[in-house]
Amino acid sequence: MKITVGCGHLKTDDLDQILSFVSPNLAILDSRSVCGIEHLHQAATLSLSSHNNGFNLSKDKSTEVLLYLTFQRQISKALSLSGVNKTTKNVGWVSFGKASIDLSEIITEDDSVISIHNYDFSKLAKDVDISLDNDLKQKIIMTRTAVLPVQPR
């Protein structure tokens, strides 16, 4: 199954309209919960792998992406940390399979919105020393993402 990721600025602040695009195969998330495009690719790949191999925590691949991005086992916590809300201005997205909708209706693509510089360490990784080198901080976050399946329940 093909995985496509992207990011950009929201064109609307109509939360209902934005959420109407979300489906089991399309995740739209707050870009501040993504520590670089590699992190988004990693979460998408792990989500697909978990569903293909029967160790998924969520019934939908799109929700599973949020769990991996935030290294959470509880959907409600993952949604509060990375879900789109009234204050979200920039988003990342993951599509599994052929995209059947046109996100350009609600998103202006801009690759710069997802970066380690925009990652919300204060909300998602308070214990990471922000004075560390950016590559090291990203490795820490991506390691936490990778070990989610082996964490005790």
Walk through the language-model features, giving the residues of each:
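Ordered, amphipathic secondary-structure segments that act as subunit-interaction surfaces
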Residues: 37-99
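Hydrophobic, Leu/Ile/Phe/Ala-enriched alpha-helical segments that form helix-helix packing faces
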Residues: 18-23, 82, 106-107
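Glycine-rich, aromatic-bearing surface loops/beta-hairpins
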Residues: 83-153
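Residue-identity detector for glutamine
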Residues: 17, 42, 72-74, 138, ...
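N-terminal interaction modules that seed assembly of large macromolecular complexes
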Residues: 4-61
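Residue-level signal for functionally critical sites in structured catalytic/ligand-binding pockets
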Residues: 30, 60-74, 105-113, 141, ...
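Short, surface-exposed beta-edge/turn micro-motifs
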Residues: 2-4, 25, 88-92
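Hydrophobic side chains in well-ordered alpha-helices
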Residues: 15-18, 78, 103
